């Protein structure tokens, strides 16, 4: 029987007033659950000295080579990030932004925010039409859609503070790939045909790079990017100033000025990547570190884990109706809170302490009825004291000393705006769509935002990107993350729960079918692979089940007690690779 809803409000009111709850101390981290079966269904890649997991085989090899040359995990991560800007242009980028989570061999965990920023001339209603309704063409495919890019600044900050190799060395592999070219693989060919065709043919600079004889490049064609190679050479020689104050800045600002965009040289010169304190929590004795705002991921992963801690997930079992019901109901509440409270922390007060408090989670858990789903129409954000495509991309790196890096970055939708800035070879993002063009109206991924995420100058839009590091007994245990827009949070959540509660190795946790609920729309989205009987049970309990396409593309590394590395790339993607030595 559900406890009265007002208990939740009492708990929240106390938190907002500065009150405290006595919460039982977390037990030491238990070993992952064992089912007494020795044989694994899926086998991870194994290495001892270093490992890289990314969506592209060429980029993964670049990272492994940097590790072999004596670079640490940060050096390798930056090299992979620049390489993906060449080999995976649908999401890898210089003209976008993202987040990095890193944990040093000494146990320091930190977050680097290089999310795009709204230009100084941005205004709250800039994406509304004459009738006051959101105009997706403005926020997705026009020059107005681009925020000031952060990738180059973020990589530079990470390398300067935590790397060991010079920028010139880690950028060289990307320069070579851009200058000499590489063979187009299945993933790029398919995305150019499916998504690129919607935006790239509208812009001659872009078409000249990715089209041949009037058609998108096909598998087996060679992609050479001479202009991008020159831009990378400028960055290698002159550092981030080449991008934010030098000739690349000139190209971007000129492209904007000629086509009605807002980014100016002043916007570029003022951009700074920011190092932030990670969001942290505990789950059954494991420590969980993830991104703080402007990512909503860290807060809500911890929030949902806190709710699940009140249930015996291991006893329920993976793929059971009970486990899926509890997780779906927890996800609904978290996404409702997201819509109300999450935004850019430099502009709005984000009540992260209340949202991640275990007493608040207990009040939510007490409301969940395992036998009856609560309609989303009856769920409101807690009275506390809120969007990327599948072509966001994530990569993970761990080195021989135990340094670990998780990076998720993006252009937003596939190939961003499709606009290449002048002769820079750099595709520009359409990240401005991640703001709430009109609070209460869903964005391109169906996510609803409030006033906290409204458009405003110098603001960074809310994101679901959730690079995450899990620590066991003081040592890095799992490094993970995923693309997937609104489904990033639940994809990463299931990697953690599959590993801890259901005793899966990293490959099994990656391969397991996934599900997702984001409050609105009121739909439990599931991949193929769950028992039809289970889905019928969920429908009988009030869930509106819909079998949909694959979700996410995790790139994960697990560290064994002896330091051995076990990695897995997601089979939902093609041409990705986990490798080590």
Task: Please place each PLM-identified region on the residue numbering.
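Bacterial N-terminal signal peptides
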Residues: 10-20
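Noncatalytic scaffold domains of N-terminal-nucleophile
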Residues: 26-61, 73-74, 78-238, 243-245, ...
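Active-site rim segments in enzyme catalytic domains, especially the processed small/beta chain
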Residues: 86-111, 262-264, 404-472, 502, ...
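Internal maturation/activation junctions in enzymes
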Residues: 311-411, 423-424, 439-440, 448
């Amino acid at each position: 029987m559900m406890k009265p809803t007002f208990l939740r409000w009492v708990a929240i009111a106390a938190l907002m007033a500065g009150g405290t709850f006595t919460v039982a101390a977390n037990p030491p981290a238990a070993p992952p659950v064992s089912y007494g079966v020795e044989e694994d269904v899926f086998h991870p890649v194994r290495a001892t000295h270093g490992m890289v997991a990314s969506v592209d085989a060429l980029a993964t090899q670049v990272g492994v080579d940097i590790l072999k040359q004596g670079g640490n995990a940060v050096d390798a991560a930056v090299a992979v990030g620049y390489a993906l800007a060449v080999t995976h242009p649908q999401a890898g980028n210089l003209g976008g932004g993202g987040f990095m989570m890193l944990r040093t061999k000494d146990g320091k965990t930190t977050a680097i925010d290089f999310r795009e920023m709204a230009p100084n001339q941005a205004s709250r209603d800039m994406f509304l039409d004459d009738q006051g309704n959101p105009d997706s063409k403005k926020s997705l495919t026009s020059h107005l859609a681009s925020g000031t890019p952060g990738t180059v600044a973020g990589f530079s900050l990470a390398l300067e503070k935590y790397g060991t190799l010079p920028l010139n060395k880690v950028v060289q592999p990307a320069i070579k790939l851009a200058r000499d070219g590489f063979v187009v693989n299945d993933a790029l060919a398919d995305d150019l045909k499916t998504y690129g065709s919607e935006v790239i043919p509208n812009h001659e600079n872009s078409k000249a790079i990715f089209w041949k004889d009037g058609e998108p490049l096909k598998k087996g064609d060679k992609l050479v990017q001479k202009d991008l190679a020159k831009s990378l050479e400028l960055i290698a020689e002159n550092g981030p100033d080449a991008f934010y104050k030098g000739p690349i800045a000139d190209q971007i600002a000129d492209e904007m000025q000629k086509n009605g965009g807002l980014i100016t040289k002043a916007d570029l010169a003022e951009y700074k990547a920011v190092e932030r304190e990670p969001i942290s929590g505990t789950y059954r004795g494991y420590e969980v570190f993830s991104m703080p705002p402007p990512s909503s991921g860290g807060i809500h992963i911890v929030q949902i884990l806190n709710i699940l801690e009140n249930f015996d997930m291991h006893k329920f079992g993976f793929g059971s109706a009970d486990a899926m019901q509890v997780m779906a109901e927890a996800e609904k509440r978290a996404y409702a809170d997201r819509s109300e409270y999450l935004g850019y922390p430099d502009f709005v007060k984000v009540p992260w302490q209340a949202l991640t408090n275990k007493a608040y989670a207990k009040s939510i858990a007490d409301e969940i009825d395992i036998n009856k789903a609560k309609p989303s129409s009856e769920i409101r954000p807690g009275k506390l004291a809120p969007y990327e495509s599948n072509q966001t991309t994530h990569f993970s790196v761990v080195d021989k000393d135990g340094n670990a890096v998780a990076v998720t970055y993006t252009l937003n939708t596939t190939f961003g705006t499709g606009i290449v800035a002048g002769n820079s070879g750099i595709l520009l993002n359409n990240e401005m769509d991640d703001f709430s063009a009109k609070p209460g109206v869903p964005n391109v991924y169906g996510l609803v935002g409030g006033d906290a995420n409204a458009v405003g100058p110098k603001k960074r839009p809310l994101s679901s990107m959730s690079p995450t590091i899990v620590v066991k007994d003081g040592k890095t245990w799992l490094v993970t993350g995923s693309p997937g827009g609104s489904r990033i949070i639940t994809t990463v959540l299931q990697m953690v729960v599959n590993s801890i509660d259901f005793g899966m190795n990293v490959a099994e946790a990656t391969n397991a079918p996934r599900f997702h609920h984001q409050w609105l729309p009121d739909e439990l989205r599931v991949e193929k692979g769950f028992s039809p009987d289970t889905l019928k049970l969920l429908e009988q309990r009030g869930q509106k089940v819909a079998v949909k396409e694959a979700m996410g593309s995790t790139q994960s590394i697990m560290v064994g007690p002896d330091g051995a590395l076990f990695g897995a790339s997601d089979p939902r993607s093609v041409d990705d690779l986990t490798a080590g030595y």
